[in-house]
């Protein structure tokens, strides 16, 4: 075995420091989980294969939480915002349980939704499970939004969801 030249040793040391610096300078701040490929709309601008029924099964909540548990020793959970997306995440029937499990682990969590399934009862359940953030997609005025989303009531239902959210002081954005 030959000894490494000083030049190669310096290059390896510099590469190691750069790699370690990246971990320190770019800590995990947001983690997005596409929890389903099912969606209750058929948006013209969407590039995903999401549809009302999907051949792709949803990732089991237990598998996702195992991933979170493997990350937890390496981060401050309070500093990592977990965003649940889809498809339409509210098509899952275990979202409150997942949210509560994240909340108990110290993670702030939120979701991105089209708002169609965000009833008052649904919102209260999510809030009780520690919901921290939520985004409702809105693509313009009623005519444009409904056309883009392929649903005649999607604008009104998204607006109803937004009106509910305005009254939740615990939500940050």
Language model features: what each stretch is:
Residues 56-59, 63, 149-157:
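Alpha-helix N-cap and loop-to-helix initiation/capping positions
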Residues 89-90, 115-120, 137-152:
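Conserved radical SAM core fold
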Residues 96, 137, 155-158:
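Hydrophobic alpha-helical segments
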Residues 162-173:
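Conserved strand-turn element in the central/C-terminal portion of the radical SAM core barrel
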